[in-house]
From Swiss-Prot:
This is Histidinol-phosphate aminotransferase 1. It catalyses: L-histidinol phosphate + 2-oxoglutarate = 3-(imidazol-4-yl)-2-oxopropyl phosphate + L-glutamate. Belongs to the class-II pyridoxal-phosphate-dependent aminotransferase family. Histidinol-phosphate aminotransferase subfamily. It comes from the Bacteria. Signal peptide: none annotated. Its cofactor is pyridoxal 5'-phosphate. It comes from Rhizobium meliloti (strain 1021) (Ensifer meliloti). GO terms for molecular function: histidinol-phosphate transaminase activity; pyridoxal phosphate binding. Its EC number is 2.6.1.9.
Amino acid sequence: MNLALKSPAPRSGILDIAAYVPGKEHAPGVAKVHKLSSNETPLGASPRAIEAFQKAAFNLERYPDGQANALKEAIAAVHGLNPANILCGNGSDELLGLLCHTYLGPGDEGIVTEHGFLVYKIQITASGGTPVTVKERQERVDVDAILAAVTERTKIVFIANPANPTGTYIPVEEVRRLHAGLPAGVLLVLDAAYAEYVRRNDYEAGLELVSSNRNVVMTRTFSKIYGLAGLRIGWMYAPRDVVEALDRVRGPFNLNAAAIAAGAAAIRDQAFVAAAVDQNHTWLAKIGQALTDIGLRVTPSVTNFVLIHFPEEAGMSASDADAYLTSRGFILRAVGAYGFPNALRMTIGSEEANKGVVAALTEFMGRK
C-alpha cells in the first residue's frame, strides 16, 4: 500500500497508451458534408434490419438474451457453422479486448504489424502485455517477419486480413504458412472486418483454419457492409475452449436486444449484402483509376476504401489535401498514426460523394 498517493493511480503502462481517435465527422462552415472517414457503407442498413430494430423498441424493459442466441443461430445458418463456436460482442473491438485480457499478462508479448489496426496495441498494453511491431512488405502483411519475431514470450498474433488502412490482403496459402510456423500455444487472431468485400479466389476469411485448429480465431463485424456501426455488433468464430474462456470474463449482457434483432435480420438479408458488394466493386475500380489518372498513387485495395498517397512537395501534402477537401465538405481519414504521414484513406461512398472527391482532388493536383 502506498499511503503517499494523493489520488488513485492507474496501473503501470496505462497512461502510456495513446487513446484511439476515430475519423472526424465535421467540416466547419460547410453546408453539406460527405463523411468518408470511417468506412461506413453508403447504402445504410437492410430494411429488414431496420424493421427488426424498430420492433425491439416494444420490449425495452426486458433484459436481452445473454447468449445472443438468435444472432448466433443466424450467423451459423448463413455461414454453415456450429453456434457453439460463435461468440458475439459489443463490436469486434470488445472481442479483441477480451482475447487480450484472457490470453495475455505481464511479461507476455503480442505481435502486430506496423500498419495494423491501432486497437491491437491498445488492448495488448491494457492487458499488461508488450506489443511487438513487425515491418510489412510493400504495404502487406509479411509472414516471414512475423515468424521471425516469435519468442517464448509470444502469446498472440494479430493480423487484419484484409488490412486497414491499406486495403491489402494476403492469400489463404500465406495465412496457412503463418499458422504452420507458430507454436501451438500461440493464438492467431484473424481480423476479417472487411471480408465480405473481397472478390479474390485466393482469399479465405479464416473459417477453414478455425475449423481445423485449436489456436486460431476469426473476428467479424456488422459495422461495415451490414451498415450497423451505430449498434456495435461483432462476432467471433473460435474453438470451443476459447469461446468458453471468453464467456467467463465478458459482461453478462454485452449485446443489447435491438442489436441482436437487427443483426440477425441483417445477416439473413444476403440479397442486400450482394447489392452492397456490387456497388462497392464498381466504384472501387472507378475511384482507383480516376485518382491514378491525376497523378496520385493508390494502394491496390480489396475493401471499401482506398489509401491515397500524396506528393512530397510543399503545398501538396496529405495535410494540405485534407484541408482542401474538408473546406469543400469531403471528410477523409488522416492516417499518420498508422505510419502513413503523407496519405489519406477514403471510404467508397455514394456516387455524389465519390465524384465530388475526384473533382476536388483534380482541382487540388492542378494547382502544382
